[in-house]
Amino acid sequence: MSRGIIIIGSGFAARQLVKNIRKQDAHVPLTLIAADSMDEYNKPDLSHVISQSQRADDLTRQLAGEFAEQFNLRLFPHTWVADIDADAHVVKSQDKQWQYDKLVLATGATAFVPPITGRELMLTLNSQQEYRACETQLRDAQRVMIVGGGLIGSELAMDFCRAGKTVTLMDNAASLLASLMPPEVSSRLQHHLTDMGVHLLLKSQLQKLEKTEAGIRATLVSQRNIEVDAVIAATGLRPETALARRAGVAVNRGVCVDSYLQTSHPDIYAIGDCAEINGQVLPFLQPIQLSAMYLAKNLLGGNAPLKLPAMLVKVKTPELPLHLAGETQRRDLSWQITAESDGMIAKGMSGEGQLRAFVVSEDRMKEAFALLKTLSV
């Protein structure tokens, strides 16, 4: 008798995988185990909750029970997996255990909080659960500091500013989105945020946070003090690999998987933000959607390697949205930038004259798909 497939996690990757499995097999036993409620919500919406006056519960799209009924699943919400015995094919919680034929780790990633004095005063917005824990404080806060000027930090800075709050956005780097693109490309967004009233503190580092009667005092390494009501850490995500380590599978930055999404153990797979696919961590929606399609086939007896095409990454800053694709972080590209009132096109060219990356903004985003077809990968 089939023991079926167990998926640990309940986020976007887990749900996409369930839907793809059920398209092909209505009966294989499917069990999902997760530490949260397993209710569905759209994680990218967290970048806009403040300006849209949304409460955490407003984000819920489908209750866990409805999901289980729709896709014929066994669900175990609010359940912490304590251990995995890979040889025995057993998953263990504190008071239960489950046997499996195939196991999928969809454990996601956790927000990195800088190890400074007062780090416990920092808030994170990496899940509906985290937002629920701090939504009152964030709604009431008038002065907000966001630490980290990457994708999420830039999105949050614009959102809080649109909600009428005083926003300070801080990063160690000399420009926003520094790990994604050079300063001459990100400067359009940087100038727009400044024009909106966001205070940018670049080439700056936080030293400590202290609770005060009026709120929180943030002290920079430069010894400058800034008084705020809330501090949000947007300093990146760390793939959740603890369970994989316990199972004895190979781990690097994420859970190491090959083109079949298979770990170093033949019956354990990983998908989503926790996975490192052939050395790459790809915490974006499109690679996860494609991964779910291929992994579903392979779990059901197929043998199809994942092939990822050139894909768009969207920066959800509504007043100046951006799409980017290719190797935008490469330092050896020559950038050709056309900036006009209706938007920007920035093309990253190799020494051989090949288009290796591009960034488009505003009305020029409609040209993204045509550029995608000419991208050298």
UniProtKB/Swiss-Prot annotation:
Matches recorded under NCBIfam families: PRK04965.1
Catalytic reaction(s) noted: 2 reduced [nitric oxide reductase rubredoxin domain] + NAD(+) + H(+) = 2 oxidized [nitric oxide reductase rubredoxin domain] + NADH
Name the record gives this protein: Nitric oxide reductase FlRd-NAD(+) reductase
This protein's pathway: Nitrogen metabolism; nitric oxide reduction
Compartments reported by the entry: Cytoplasm
Coiled coil region boundaries: none
InterPro entries registered for this protein in UniProt: FAD-bd_OxRdtase, FAD/NAD-bd_sf, FAD/NAD-binding_dom, NO_rdtase_NorW, Rbx-bd
Organism of provenance: Salmonella schwarzengrund (strain CVM19633)
